[in-house]
Amino acid sequence: LIKGVFELLYSENRGAAFGMMQEKQLFFFLIAVLVLGAVAYLIYKMPSDGKYRPLAVCLMMISAGAVGNMIDRVSQGYVVDFLYFKLINFPIFNVADCYVTIGAACLVFLIMFYYKDEDMACFSLKKQ
């Protein structure tokens, strides 16, 4: 796409991000199911107040990425990675990885700098 900087390169990733933990398909499937369950719980508990919309977007991005990679793993036994920043020799990744990474980074930012402890009380497992 941009010679020497950004290329499309086909790679079959049987591991986690950046090729770690190869051949652990069941583990990744279970992690994805746990993440989706946690997101479903948080969405269920989330007030409909517009203040929580950025949080919902982050959770949906993480879910979309998890589902995208899970579909690849279940249907093919591996995730297809194809985006490669050659300039910095960054590990090959895919769009689902972008969704998970950006969603998680924004989620951390929101929790650290936007929401207060009392905003997050609605997600507590304790009876209120």
What are these language model-derived features?
Residues L1-Q128:
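Alpha-helical transmembrane bundles and membrane-interface segments of multipass inner-membrane proteins
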